Amino acid sequence: MQKTEPKSANRTALVLFLAAASIVTSAVLYLGSAQTISSHPKETHLRNIRQLTHGGTNAEAYFSADGKKLIFQSTRDSYKCDQIFSMNSDGSNLQLVSTGKGRTTCAYYTPDGKRVIYASTHLGSPDCPPAADRSAGYAWAIYKTFDIFSAKPDGTDMKRLTSTVGYDAEATISPDGKKIIFTSTRDGDIDLYEMNIDGSSPRRLTNDLGYDGGAFYSQDGQWIVWRANRPKTADEVKTYKDLLARDLVMPSKMEIMIMKTDGSQRKQLTSNGAANFAPYFLPNGKQIVFSSDMNNKAQGIPNFDLYLINRDGSGLQQISFDEGFDAFPMFSPDGKKLVWAASRHGAKEGDIDIFIADWAE
């Protein structure tokens, strides 16, 4: 899963929220409270919007199974690259989960709430890894030092789950708590893999040339949704392979994909040539919420909004209408609340905060 940059006339749209984490005992940093904000009049699905974080770059907030906690990644205060934090779903009791070493990304609770998983570069170096080389255009860095770890929610009892050479990150957990789906370069391309919750028995799920990542299970465990880039022309294939050799990938064109967990019924849901990413199943299993810049009208100024689409690819509808960045949506387990990251109401340019709203059908 990734980091993204908000509205800026001299920046492109997405930044990989790739991060690294090592874990020790977490520390309580801040006792916050949610702040109710106004919304765009067209945002009829979003009621009672509250801002949960205030300042810094915050994203990929995911609920615990009981809906009481959120775990997310943040660059803030003295931390120069993303670290993992948790907080109550009202924004209170903010706690550092990772140690502040390296870069972290994509944290997720186990269904029983007893452990969390996330990816970290801290074994490669305690320092933040270098920024992506963008001399050839806007790109995400696919850090080879990323591995996936498991820990208790307070950051203790850290266990390494992957140890192959190359990028292992973007991990989420199946509803029964038995499997982890993740993205890896272990076989030479950027593909989806599934492994047991303890890191054993990994198996490859995708094998088409191109990036596959950011996968989530449906709540019934029958489906997987993810984002993918498929280079088609000779020039696109060459560019993709050249960037991959430098541990980079361009995210400007990605489409939303689904398949059954056994690999059958694979289907591409979007075909708009935009940057479609961060898909997540609604609890009903019939719809998917995701972020896209498909309606971006201003050149060079990223404008990402939230959208709904049916599992068969029909019924596309826009959910958010605020200018700037709206992404990384996730529903609470009961489907009553939506949490996401946005640049709206930022204290300064570059801020991305976590927001929560009551969901209205």
Predicted regions and their residues:
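Blade/loop signatures of beta-propeller domains
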Residues: G32-R47, F146
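Beta-strand-rich domains and repeat architectures in extracellular enzymes and scaffolds
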Residues: I37, N48-K80
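Hydrophobic beta-strand positions that form the internal "hydrophobic ladder"
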Residues: L70-I71, V116, I180-I181, I224, ...
